[in-house]
């Protein structure tokens, strides 16, 4: 694949991606995707609460969009007044009546009634004498916005748990999914800001590797651990790299060697684009270290939204020609909003990520093919 610079023109990259894409693959991709979706829909017994919600409230109707906005935002808002305003905006302008008793889940149907009632509480109904649902408005006008806020916060917390298997290993090991499919365990959190935070993250990774090794032996499956390099040092940045490289390298080598001893796969997570070159340098140092050079349990993530994603693929191919194979986690990217804001605040000549998200999809398809 062709190499691009950090702030390369989106227009030039688009021309290249379109010229390289094989249209004959489109039907194959569509067919494979349709097959996966069909199989997932058939397995109703294994559907999570989130799946059931999305079946009724997709992104094809106003109600689904409203719920997704709430799920994304309401848990992050610190003050009650702003929460009330957001809930009022998203709930009262949606037509929940059309969704009553339409789902195959009692929980989702009950939630629909709750959302309908919430809409009436926040914005009391007009005289609905001809509407069979008039009693809802009369019944709930006395409840008040505080109760609605608390109920919706609780509902969103229930939904948010679908994205995280557990807050600690003791809760994670109760999941039956551990016996059925492979997982990579990640420590949710931001980069380390202090030395004590970095030490805490390091100790958490040590514990994670040891606990995952135990799970693997117990279930006979190959779960792994994902490691974020910026969690291992508070000054993991280009300007300080020469001063901090040895410390960071020692930390990551120690963790990877521990994983090697326990045969636990390690994936080095992707970072923001301004850390890409130093991340590649560290990964190469670790990958070529004498002890694990012949171990195929090491891998890393590639973010398709990065303009230099193809550069990373070319670099990875060259690296793997010198050692045992490595696994790659191909993602669209995790920091798009942050990357845009970072470049704007810094007055950069462009953006290090593709602005048009459809180009990210195309780039991901080309890398995958």
Segments from the language model and where they lie:
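Positively charged, amphipathic and often flexible ligand-engagement surfaces
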Residues: 1-366
